[in-house]
Amino acid sequence: MSVATQPTIWLADPIPSTCKAWLSERSTLVDGPSSDVEAVVVRTATQVDRALLELMPQLRCVGRAGVGVDHIDLKACTERGLVVVNTPEANTESVVEYAIALLLDAVRPRADIPNDSSHELWESSRRQLTGGRRLAEYRIGILGFGRIGQRLGKVLQVLGAEIAFHDLKDESHFPRGFSSRSLEDLFAWSDIVSVHVDGRSENRGLVTGELLESLGPSGLLLNTSRGWVINTRDLQHWLAHHPQARAILDVHEEEPVPMADPLRNFSNARLLPHLASRTESAVEAMGWVVRDVMAVLTGSEPNHRVC
């Protein structure tokens, strides 16, 4: 492809250098929206709304380096006849590994021996860090049973845990061997609930105080999906009134978490900086959405088409 015929692409958000170099050999990269742009590549920071789309009249493709597309106006894209592509399988294993690690942190606490540790510290550490139950003795509910939820369920089953799930889709859409429950029943049945729902607007505030109360005074809530899925005020009330309850939150309604966020003051809330998908290999795999972008621009069918 000659320079004269290369498509113009805007990298709205940064992608790995290997992916950018590959794309730069096949296209002309620009720093912002313009009338010449035929494709835009985004991660999570850039909101692709109607106003932005109007700045790019020649646009043909939106590439999402990642999975969720709730920050992309799919209706507007469809009306314009734009193709939206993403990388739905790029970070599944990274998120599942991270969720398992956080669950093990919660049920099997551990610590290193300090270099200057005494006999008394050794004994007190053994007493304080003794886990209550093995992971296999917990009932674990998975809220949202897509790629990540299903993979997590399979891994937890191998470890011996009893698994149930809730999803908007009918049970017939999912593999056998997992129990489907209503949203209310899932929280009432579970010792631990791990949240893996998508970014559709209907999921905002999905986890209410009533559901948290049914999870119980010693329940554990893990969220690696979207921060706004949980009603924050209800979560604070639940944690304040149930000291044995715990929340592990990798995602937050506002990121970075504000210094004034009340959840910072809860000893039974663990706040993490949105790390679930952050392995170098997963980030690079997400960056390779540029291959599907080029497929669209050269008239081929992409591997992962959203609309």
Task: Tell what function each PLM region has.
Residues 1-85, 188, 208:
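An N-terminal-biased, well-structured beta-alpha scaffold segment characteristic
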Residues 3, 78, 85-98, 112, ...:
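C-terminal helix-to-coil terminal segments
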Residues 6, 59, 136-139, 218:
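Phosphate-coordination loops involved in phosphoryl transfer and adenosine-cofactor binding
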Residues 11, 41-42, 64, 194-195, ...:
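Redox-cofactor binding/interface segments in oxidoreductases and associated redox assembly factors
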Residues 48-50, 164, 168-262:
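Rossmann-like adenosine-cofactor binding region
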Residues 56-61, 80-82, 161, 217-219, ...:
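A short helix->loop->beta-strand "cap" motif at the edges of active sites that frequently abuts
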Residues 88-139, 151:
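Phosphate-binding beta-alpha-beta segment of Rossmann-like dinucleotide-binding domains, i.e.
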Residues 145-146:
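Glycine-rich Rossmann-fold phosphate-binding loop(s) that bind the pyrophosphate
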